[in-house]
Amino acid sequence: RLLKFFLLLLIYTVILIFTCGKQGAFFSVVMLLAMKDVNMDNKNYKICFWVGVVFFIVACYLNKDGAEAVRFMNGEWVNMNKRSNILYVAFTALVCLYLLKYRDRLNNMRILGVVIVNYLIYLYVGSRTGVISIIFLVVMILLFRSQRFRRMKIIKYGCVFSPLICMIFSIVAGVKYDEYSFLKILDMMLQGRIAQNNAYLDRYDIKLFGQHIYEGAENGDFWNLDCAYLDMLICEGLIFAVLWIVVSTALIKYMYNNNRMVEVAILVMYAIYGISETFLLNCFLNMSLFLYGEYLYIQFNKIPNPIRC
């Protein structure tokens, strides 16, 4: 049964390579398949963390001089020299690995350490989305220590349905961009991402198996879809977008019901991060995919939850 499931996923993601031209979903499925019989305990998270630290330090050094990038500043697109936001995405992955490693021993000193390093990385990279995401993650973990907070239905269902909420927000904000002034203000804060979402929704139809989309800046005409949810919907297609939301919702509900609140905080943080980045399908950058793999194997093998906090 499990083999048939992954075989279908592999065939489906191979089809997506031809229909949309992106390989992220395929390699993520390969990673999930490789997780068979691998117990993602603290030891494995520790190994992943320290290997990641080495590569992150090397990446920071190689990117020390920055590179030319196009950014939306004061209502217009401008060229500027800055360090890549991918560095912050990679740092976020390291933070998640660290939190998963110490999920049972996550004291205030370790959390304070995360906050301090987060600020230092922000000074080096300058990604507002990244620094806010880590702060949100830390705040969520601290709030989840309260039984009363965890038992609030609005919190539980807000977390469980966060992927769907973020998907709906991305679509509605893109469609209604020209109708509401507050969306234009929010667009400037998000460096033109909502305007780009609006442009892509106008330019492309939604297809079941996705399509190739143009991204580039030829003749000063800048096109860049920097939203994971619209990238799934437009590029990977309606089937994939629905599948992602359904599985993500089920996963967060499972973690919440089993009191695995560090994992819930990580999953919700990534769900929100996807509003302004497209790396959710990248198994090298999205560490929550380890949790997807764990959940799928538990469901198919009908084994008990290995960790209850």
Label the model's feature ranges.
Residues 194-222, 238-240:
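TM-adjacent membrane-interface loops and short helices in multi-pass inner/ER membrane proteins
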Residues 182-186:
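Alpha-helical transmembrane signal-anchor/signal-peptide segments
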Residues 1-181, 202, 220-307:
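Hydrophobic transmembrane helix bundles of membrane-integrated enzymes that assemble
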